[in-house]
Amino acid sequence: MNAIWIAVAAVSLLGLAFGAILGYASRRFAVEDDPVVEKIDEILPQSQCGQCGYPGCRPYAEAISCNGEKINRCAPGGEAVMLKIAELLNVEPQPLDGEAQELTPARMVAVIDENNCIGCTKCIQACPVDAIVGATRVMHTVMSDLCTGCNLCVDPCPTHCISLQPVAETPDSWKWDLNTIPVRIIPVEHHA
């Protein structure tokens, strides 16, 4: 019985010692992040699209801060993001890069081919917003109002019955920018 307690104490002391060493090393050898990179990364839209030529927003922010990369290459962010970065870095705003056009991608929604769905629930487990409804061995359905089009449910599906399809724009789904609609105000006295 004493041998068990000695072994437990020895393993506990080893764990405590290694924990203390790791804690010290994490503080002693900590790498400081560049605050300018952090601020640029916060401004970028975080779409991780790669249209700027970098694999994501963070590498593009590092290239802007450290390597002097152009600030006008973010297509999803467009002119608004470029102006914020120019203000942050105190540089002249630049026109959008010819290749980087401000695009508003069509909203995509997952669609399940219910004839091929085997009800495995792998897509339900993968969906981060719980937009898929169904049960084991029962066909599943996507609630299009909740679906963000993130594409995370497509790969886990063993029968490949899930696809992303663009949502048709209707007057109900259109995002109206009321500031750009010309409005003429008619004085009240002319209404009678």
From Swiss-Prot:
Belongs to the 4Fe4S bacterial-type ferredoxin family. RnfB subfamily. PANTHER family: ION-TRANSLOCATING OXIDOREDUCTASE COMPLEX SUBUNIT B. It comes from Shigella flexneri. It is found in: Cell inner membrane. Part of a membrane-bound complex that couples electron transfer with translocation of ions across the membrane. Required to maintain the reduced state of SoxR. This is Ion-translocating oxidoreductase complex subunit B. InterPro entries: 4Fe-4S_dom, 4Fe4S_Fe-S-bd, 4Fe4S_Fe_S_CS, 4Fe4S_Ferredoxin_RnfB, Elect_transpt_cplx_RnfB/RsxB, RnfB/RsxB_Proteobac. Its EC number is 7.-.-.-. Its cofactor is [4Fe-4S] cluster.
